[in-house]
Amino acid sequence: MKILLLEPYFTGSHKSWAEGYQSNSAHEIQIISLPGQFWKWRMHGGAITIAKEFLQLDFDPDLIIATDMLDLTSFLSLTRERTSHIPTVLYFHENQITYPWSLTDRDVQEKRDVHYGFINLSSALAADHVLFNSKYHLNSFMTGGKKILKHFPDHQELDTIDKIQSKSRIYILV
């Protein structure tokens, strides 16, 4: 199987996981990544750069695996002519709903800290399959996701959590 792995924050544990998966898998894995810096910008703009790189790449994957740092909805909308028929998996190595924030972060101080979690939610909704690395991680994402949606004044779309849950699994990639 030919797998395209998308990682916009290629450093530390993200890099170790991606390279470990690539080197230990029986599948042919092509990684498109960006340097592991400016994590907020990677979550906003990384999909645009990665989409551009993918469209220039001579690689036709059977499966696309994106990590939680990618805005999968933006990537898919920018690459639909090549990706509309390819199954997608969103892999949560971590997530921005339950990841601890620094109290000195300006987004926390200005009460804007739900935006990155919402990117994770919309990406999970857009993916065909959603994988988590532990049961705790899956459960805390679903609970936290519902809490984020309840934060909004209307059209909370709480049923989207059930849709995400129905296509979510705990999985160690091999």
Model features per residue range: what roles?
Residues 126-167, 172:
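A short, active-site helix/loop in glycosyltransferases that binds the activated sugar's phosphate group
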